[in-house]
A protein has these predicted regions:
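Active-site anion-handling motifs in enzyme catalytic cores
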Residues: 1-194
Length: 194
């Protein structure tokens, strides 16, 4: 739904109905494409398709990007009943959503962990577990602009970073997303798929 990195180019022809955010739109315009000023990651529409009631079971959900899943910092939480390590590669979207909804907050190095948290009203924060995720944060910044979040950079996680210091980090603050999801839904080409 958008570019991953700043120096990327669109491949071939395309009809653009919406894009992740204004940074992706500007890149398309600069490359000669037409692109309406309609923003939003399609995952923000998930609650219109699937929105079960779930009780909160975990203080924190951690969603590592697939490239970060073997990060040693995560090992300390494997047996902690208050922490839910959520697999971004879960092939069942419903299971993934259920696990997010069971958490009080989400810490994620995966953009879609943050997007899905936002979609379901679970406060979600960008963490950086490694330098392996490509794009220097371009897709995160693009998304944050689309929903009018003020996030500019991730919370850096190191091997000895304590979870309490992350939860109490100055970047962890209340926010509310602000985006016209009706407009995004109106142009959505996969309406009615359940």
């Amino acid at each position: 739904s958008g570019f991953i990195k700043e120096n990327e180019e669109a491949a071939g022809e395309g009809l653009f109905l919406a894009v992740r955010g204004p940074l992706s739109r500007q890149k398309l315009l600069d490359q000669g494409f037409k692109c309406p000023e309609i923003y939003g990651d399609p995952a923000l529409l998930l609650p219109r398709i699937y929105n079960p009631l779930k009780n909160k079971q975990y203080k924190v959900g951690i969603i590592p990007h697939y490239i970060d899943q073997d990060n040693k910092w995560l090992d300390q939480f494997k047996d902690d009943p208050s922490i839910n390590i959520i697999d971004i590669l879960d092939p069942t979207v419903c299971n993934f959503v259920d696990e997010i909804k069971k958490c009080e907050i989400i810490l994620s190095s995966s953009l879609h962990g943050i997007v899905c948290g936002d979609a379901y009203g679970v406060p979600s924060y960008w963490i950086k577990l490694s330098n392996k995720v490509i794009g220097k944060g371009f897709k995160f910044k693009d998304y944050f602009l689309s929903v009018k979040r003020n996030d500019k950079k991730p919370i850096i996680i190191k091997k000895n970073t304590k979870l309490d210091s992350v939860i109490n980090h100055r970047l962890i603050k209340d926010y509310k997303i602000d985006i016209d999801l009706d407009l995004l839904y109106k142009v959505c080409p996969f309406k009615g798929i359940h």
